[in-house]
Design a protein with these regions (language model features):
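Bacterial N-terminal signal peptides
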Residues: 2-14
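N-terminal Sec/ER secretory leader and immediately downstream segment
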Residues: 20-131
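Non-transmembrane, amphipathic alpha-helical segments
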Residues: 73, 77-80, 84, 92-99, ...
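Generic structural concept
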Residues: 86-89, 108, 112, 151, ...
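Secondary-structure edge/capping motif, primarily at the C-terminal ends of alpha-helices
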Residues: 92-99, 118, 122, 157-161, ...
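Short, charged, amphipathic alpha-helical segments
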Residues: 105-109, 129, 169-172, 194-201, ...
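Extended amphipathic alpha-helical interaction segments
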Residues: 134-220
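A cross-kingdom marker for long, charged
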Residues: 215-267
Length: 267
């Protein structure tokens, strides 16, 4: 699978306006987006599950369940709810991929609570049983399908609520959780081939532009501004000179910034 290695877009760093949404590359779009003429719209965001297609090359990913306790209390801010929901979708895959299927019931429960708080609870209920069944069977393929459907149905519900910004934050939260897991795994067991998977400056650039183009009521929140600053720093950390291979020190820097971003996303 080469989806991660052909990921995202723009190399320019600027402040995107609401009318200048960064373009999403086709390989990050869920297949369903191509089945209807009206599928691509302001609510369309990169699929968290697509990110994991290539990350499976980094086996095992790094996983620590300690942060799941933080999700027991729901944040009041809807933007933080969305970011955390994205990290939970990613957690579901990482838990099974690393042999921690016993954590999936907790993750599924948190997913349902967060989706309900965002107004998308009814759609998510139907996926909870599937997540548990696939996790118990350790069926990563079907689990990814259920997680993709979870993200897609939340996206649809938010479309009905006319709240596209939250869809973008869910996607960002998922990518950050995946990146932290992958970068920590590569840091512990470094090879150039594994490290190459991480160095996607265009991905960091896309998400920096994406959150910069959100409604000012969200994009100007202090923690969002800080996350955007960190994403620009991550883009710099991921930049490799032509013909150069990533080094262990560069992987450590990516892991460090990714950890800062995930910590912010989980607040």
């Amino acid at each position: 699978m080469n989806l991660w290695l052909t990921l995202i877009l723009f190399l320019s760093i600027g402040i995107a306006t609401a009318d200048e949404k960064p373009e999403i590359p086709e390989d990050l779009l869920d297949d369903e987006h191509f089945r209807t003429e009206t599928a691509l719209n302001e609510f369309t965001v990169p699929s968290i599950v697509k990110v994991f297609d290539e990350l499976e090359k980094i086996s095992l990913l790094a996983y620590n369940s300690a942060h799941l306790k933080r999700h027991e209390r729901l944040p009041l801010d809807r933007s933080r709810l969305a970011l955390r929901l994205g990290t939970l979708i990613a957690d579901g895959f990482i838990a099974v991929q690393t042999g921690n299927s016993d954590d999936v019931p907790t993750i599924a429960s948190h997913l349902s609570r967060y989706a309900k708080a965002l107004g998308a609870g009814d759609r998510i209920k139907r996926h909870a049983a599937s997540l548990l069944d696939h996790a118990k069977a350790k069926d990563l393929v079907k689990l990814k399908g259920a997680l993709a459907a979870t993200q897609r149905d939340v996206e649809r519900e938010l479309a009905g609520l006319r709240d596209p910004d939250l869809s973008h934050l869910i996607s960002l939260g998922g990518w950050l959780q995946a990146l932290e897991s992958a970068s920590n795994a590569v840091e512990k067991k470094f090879t150039v081939e594994r490290a190459r998977t991480l160095f996607r400056e265009d991905v960091a650039d896309y998400y920096a532009e994406s959150i910069g183009s959100l409604n000012p009521s969200i994009s100007e929140k202090p923690y969002i501004l800080k996350m955007r600053e960190l994403l620009h720093g991550l883009r710099t950390a991921m930049s490799l000179e032509e013909g150069k291979e990533p080094t262990e020190e560069e992987v450590k820097e990516v892991a460090r910034v990714a950890s800062q971003l995930v910590t912010s996303a989980r607040q």
